């Protein structure tokens, strides 16, 4: 019984140390939309996600706290009044890939295709 407790304690300690030893790496740039970001930084332990945000013609890429990944908080921190953003939690996931704002367009296209199929099947 004592050996099991010791093993469990050891596994818990290893889990804690392993999770804190590995830091997230994010792209870190503030630039116009047309530029591409090649700089990256290792996030501090309290920053557990990467942020990619676009406000007008400006792009923000940096480490961020997942718990602060809300539009109002991001706008306040970046001093912007309107933006599109995404947060992600794996290394260099905040690359500028042009995907912001395209999901609704894809959803609309799929919806139109489904509606067309429904109407065509009733003719």
From Swiss-Prot:
Keyword Disulfide bond in record: yes
InterPro entries: CD59 (IPR056949), LY6_UPA_recep-like (IPR016054), Snake_toxin-like_sf (IPR045860)
Residues annotated as glycosylated: 40, 94
SS bond list: 26-50, 29-37, 43-63, 69-87, 88-93
Subcellular location: Cell membrane; Secreted
Membrane topology annotation: Lipid-anchor; GPI-anchor
Any one GO biological process: regulation of complement-dependent cytotoxicity
Subunit structure: Interacts with T-cell surface antigen CD2.
Protein name, entry field: CD59A glycoprotein
The organism of origin for this protein: Mus musculus
């Amino acid at each position: 019984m004592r050996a099991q407790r010791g093993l469990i304690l050891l596994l818990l300690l290893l889990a804690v140390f392993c999770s804190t030893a590995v830091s997230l790496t994010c792209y870190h740039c503030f630039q116009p939309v047309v530029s591409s970001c090649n700089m990256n930084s290792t996030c501090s332990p309290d920053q557990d996600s990467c942020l990619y945000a676009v406000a007008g013609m400006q792009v923000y890429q940096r480490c961020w706290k997942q718990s602060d990944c809300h539009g109002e908080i991001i706008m306040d921190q970046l001093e912007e009044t309107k933006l599109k953003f995404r947060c992600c939690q794996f290394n260099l996931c905040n690359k500028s890939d042009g995907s912001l704002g395209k999901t609704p367009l894809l959803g609309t296209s799929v919806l139109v295709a489904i509606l067309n199929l429904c109407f065509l099947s009733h003719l």
